[in-house]
Every structure is written in C-alpha cells, then in structure tokens.
Amino acid sequence: MKNYLCLTALLVAGCFAQGQAQDMHYKEPPKEIKEIALAKLPPTVLVSKDGKWLMELDNVPFLDVAELAKPEYKLGGTRVTDIFGPSRREGYSALHLRNVETKQTFEIAGLPSNMNILEAEWAPGSSRIALILREADGLYLWMVNVANKQAKQISKRKMNRTASQPGPMRGMNPAIRASWVNDSVLIVPAVPQHLGAMPTPPSAPSGPVIQVSDGKAAPARTYQDLLKNPYDEQLFDYLFTAQLVKVEPNKETELGQPAIYLQTTLSPDRQMLLTTTIEKPYSYLVARASFPKRTCVLDLEGKLIKEVDKQPMTADIMGYDTTNPFPRSFGWRADKPATLYWTEAQDEGDPRKHKVEFMDAVYQWAAPFTGEKQLVVKTPFRCRSIDWCDDQFALVNEYSRANRRMKISSFVPLAPEKGLQTLFDVSTDDNYADPGRPYKTSNQYHQSVVYTNKQHSELLMIAPGGSPEGDMPYLSRYDLKKKTNTILWRCQAPYYETIVDVVDPAKLQLITARQSNSEPVNYFWRDVKRKKNV
C-alpha cells in the first residue's frame, strides 16, 4: 500500500511539474529552409507618368510576429488596426529609382532605417513621390524629390488609411488614396485632431441586439467581419472617421468636417473634390459600402458646391445581373475638366422582374451643376466601366453574369442616339478569346484616356493571351473599321513576359517583365518597330 501511495505521489508531482509555465521561444528552421522562405522577392515596379523613371519597391515576404500580435478590429467588413491602417498588410522595405534611359539606380536619402512603406504614388508631373510610412504609433506622410533623390516627412499628422483596400498597388484603393493637386500639394485623409482615447468595451451589454424583418422571405449573402453591437459601432466611428487635409509646403489646411469616407476623387482640372461619405444608421447585416451614403462635390477649401446624391442603406442584392436600384459608380470624366458621370439601372436593378431593352444608362452632369443631367449611353447588359477618349469616342465594358458574356463597345459621347458599335462579344468562360484591355495614355489633365489615332480607327490592346501553351501576353493593334486584330508583339516560350508599360505608343516602345522557371523577373526595354531589346 505504501509503495502504491508513493508511486501516486510521484505521478502527481510529475503532472504538476509538466503543467508549470515554461520559457518557450520561437525557433528558426534549418538554414536551407530559412533561405528559401526569406528569399528576396522580385520588386514591385511603378513607371513614372513621363516614362523616364522606374520606382522599385522591395516587397516584404512575411509579416513579423510583432505585427501579427497587434490587435485587429473587424468592423463593417474590414479588418483594421489601432494605428488607423489596414491590418496585416506587408508593405515594402525599400525604395530605389532607376533611370530608364541610363539604367542607373539611385538610392533615396533621408528615409528611416527598417522602414515599412505602406503606399507609394507618383505625382502627375513625375517630379515627386508620395509615401505612406507605417511606424509603431501611426502612419505618416513622406515625399521623395526625384531631382535630388531626397525624402522627408512633410506632415506630423497621423494619416487615416482604414478605408484603404487591396488594389493594383498592393494596398491602394484609387478611390481614397492621396490626391495630388499638383506636384507639391496633396489632399490626404488624416486622423482628426483631439480624437481622444479609443472606446473601451462595456462590462456587460446594455440591451439586446434587435433585428426587424419586413415579413418577406429573401435570400442574403453572409459576410464576415460585420458590426455586431453598439460597441462595434463606436469603434467603427472612432477608427474610420477621417479629416481631409490639404498639405502644402509649410502649410496644412483642414477641408470640411471629419467624416467616414468611401470616396475622395479630385476633378481633372484639380478644382473640385468628389466625396462619398457614410451616414447612420449602420447595419449588422451588410458591409460598410452598403450603409447609407451621401455623395457631394466640394471646393478645395472644403465648402459644399453640390449635393449630388443621397442613398439609404442598400440591402444585399442576390441573383445574376441584379444590382443597386440607386445611382452607382460616380466618377469624373477623364477627358473633361469637371464633368461627373454615373450609372443608373433601367430595370430597378432586377432584370427578372422588369424586362427592358437596356439594363443600364450612363448620365453626365457638368459643373457648375445647375443644368439637367444628360444621357451618355445605354447598355443592354450591366455597365462595368467606361474608358473615355473625347467627345467623339469612348469605350464601354458591359457584362451579363446570367449569360456569362462580356462586351466591349464604342460609342460617341456627344451623340448617344448613335448607339453602340460592338467590338468584342465573348464568353467569360473562354480564356482564349479574352481581348484584354485598351492601352490608355495621359491627357492634358494627367488623366488616363484611351489611346487612338486622330481618325479614331485604331486601338492598342494589351491581352493576357490565353492559349493551349498557357498565357502568352501580347500587344495588338485593333482596326475599328475592319474589326481585325493584328498582334504586334507577343511573349515567347520558354519565358512568361508581361507588359509593364507602353512608354511610347506611336513608336511602340515597351517596358516588359520577363521570367522563367530558372530565371527571376527582369525588366526589358523593347522597341517593337525596330525589333530591339535592352
């Protein structure tokens, strides 16, 4: 019996010893695995507006443990941090400039060591670069002077980038990025001054969360990271509210009142600001983009010029080709100094209930917004986007999810009665038939417009080039009259090569990125007409 008791005591003592806290640390893998995991990634390359410079950004391969351990707030369908930025965004660890002509690479002086660049944006005149740097206590605005290769912080205010969502530049939503007024003046969303401390969670709920049904059965999507209670609403207000600030050399001006922004876009003439803001009441069933919203035009002092639209909460819409019954997709015409355009459903957003010839219509409204809206074009399918050129030529991209079709058509903005001229009508399931996208150039307003000749008879198309051998991207010339496509340049096996930019469309000079199974990404200057590669 005594032996049994002793054995039991030893076992219990062993269990307690095993249950004690231990000083554990993360361990590193073997050298070979570590080298593979931390191998340097190819840089992200952004071409300057004038085509003379490459901005090379070194990608961060992984987030470190300290970043992963930071609190993450899931609000309105978005994940953000307490420093008013997107959660778990890798960013960039270094920035270099490369001269396209000389191929010389330049280091940028003045940037902090161990920096993390969250966003980078060329100025319209290519003389400067705006940066958002992530530091331990917040996000800060910096500027790079391309001429002297110097960088400096240009505002002590913390930036608010909670509205920033993944996009073409790995974390930039074009709707809410920094807006260049000129090469030295920016409009940015900042953290409001005197904001106070972050709300603290209640010790107990103050009451139940009540949801009201209108008695009608309806399908609904399920989203993650939605608001769940009044405390989430307080956090949403605190973290997403931003103050627009005009940052000039040695001067900062607040524009209007703090608000929760979905969109801030400068007019092409840089005299007005289109804003879409979120208003209460919020919803626990849909993401923030479906909350009540107000769209306005402001001047550059923040004063209201015109309220363009106001919408209630839009319930989630289910079904092929269904859409918001309210005006949507507000923007500025790229070829005009200050003309708004938007899309309106002609079938109340539901083609199953309302059979119409045209699902959508696009309207425009020119500043000073005292006249009536004007029809620009009607589309049989849903309007996805418009690529502007001028009053005589534009392209509309439309789609039908129900029919799994995509169409690209041309039209005359000045004469909507002429209707559409279909250029491409393909199945969205047919990769081989994907026509790609039209090449766009910069106009007098530093806006991207469709590149074509004076007769509007030709386009340059950049296509993914789906084929039995895989994607083989190409550049082609499309004849608008004959509706024929001539390939001018194409990726050649065993490489995968994509077009980074068309530096000179008239001379057919390109910058491409080429890689293979054994070669990392490298960049080339290609003169298609002369068949020269550098």
Residue locations for each model-derived region?
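Beta-propeller folds
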Residues: A17-K529
